[in-house]
A protein has these predicted regions:
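Conserved Class I SAM-dependent methyltransferase catalytic core
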Residues: 1-57
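S-adenosyl-L-methionine-dependent DNA methyltransferase catalytic core
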Residues: 25-29, 36, 50-192
């Protein structure tokens, strides 16, 4: 038996041809009974992350079904640390650059993922209502957007509200928690 996992768009890549090649190789050339499904990890961890899972068995398994996932996940606020080093707070230059980038894309009619609001400045944050913050920052009572491999390049995908201070990015431990890693998991690299 085997289990393969990949991005959900594997099914549609190259108009579905990539998936067909993989499926046919596993089914017809290697003689596996194949089952696949797109599953959102957001039902078990506090992160929206849709992935395709492909399982294969050497014997026929007509009754195989992927398990139904029950919404029993923590929310984002459950995995956030109480005390966070200042190095995770966005510097004014980074925060302003993100907003300029967003404004440029908004003017072109493109989306830009870190915000749903118009451009704001650090000074604006001080007067925001809780409702305004809820629309702008990651919802601590919900789940996070998909955490990409390039998160630490700019930290713009998931921003954590810090009241009157600039927002912050997630710590490596918080990222591990979002992906379901246990507390005993050792993070082998620096976060620089």
């Amino acid at each position: 038996a085997f289990l393969l996992e990949n991005v959900k768009n594997l099914k549609s890549h190259d108009k579905g041809n990539t998936f067909k090649v993989i499926y046919n190789a596993l089914k017809n050339e290697l003689d596996y009974d194949i089952h696949y499904d797109v599953i959102d990890a957001g039902k078990v961890v506090p992160q929206h992350r849709e992935r395709i899972f492909i399982v294969g068995f050497k014997e026929d398994t007509p009754d195989f079904k992927f398990p139904e996932l029950v919404d029993k996940r923590p929310v984002l606020g459950d995995v956030l640390e109480d005390e966070v080093d200042e190095k995770y707070t966005l510097k004014d230059g980074t925060w302003n650059a993100l907003q300029r980038h967003r404004a440029k894309h908004k003017a072109k009619g493109n989306g830009f993922g870190y915000s749903k609001n118009d451009k704001v400045t650090s000074a604006d944050l001080k007067s925001w209502t809780p409702e305004q913050k809820k629309r702008f920052f990651a919802d601590k009572k919900g789940i996070a957007k998909t955490l990409s491999a390039r998160y630490y390049k700019d930290g713009a995908e998931i921003l954590i509200d810090q009241g009157k201070k600039n927002p912050r990015r997630l710590t490596p431990r918080e990222c591990a928690r979002i992906m379901g890693f246990p507390e005993k998991f050792k993070i082998p690299v620096s976060d620089n």
